[in-house]
A protein has these predicted regions:
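Nucleotidyltransferase catalytic core that binds NTPs
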Residues: 1-87
Length: 87
């Protein structure tokens, strides 16, 4: 898969700042991929339903080379940090 970066967050909503950070990481760190990891249940935050946030990220990164999204997971009943999703 090459050199990858992991970009986790609530993305509520995903916005240009998120895209700029991910684009900068992709180019400045010479990454092959940036994997976006929307947090299913943010810690100490209320957020839009995970399904909606996941779809918003998918739309935002569509047609952007080097970006992909972590496979959709079932929403947890407890709060999590993005890193816990990967473990």
């Amino acid at each position: 898969m090459g050199k990858i970066g992991i970009f986790g967050g609530t993305f509520d909503p995903v916005h240009w700042g998120h895209l700029l950070i991910a684009e900068s990481a992709l180019s400045q760190m010479a990454l092959d991929w940036v994997i976006w990891v929307p947090n299913p249940r943010p810690h100490n935050k209320q957020a839009v339903l995970f399904e909606h946030r996941w779809e918003m990220v998918q739309v935002a990164i569509a047609n952007r080379p080097g970006f992909t999204i972590f496979p959709k997971l079932a929403e947890s009943s407890t709060s999590t940090y993005a890193i816990q999703t990967l473990i």
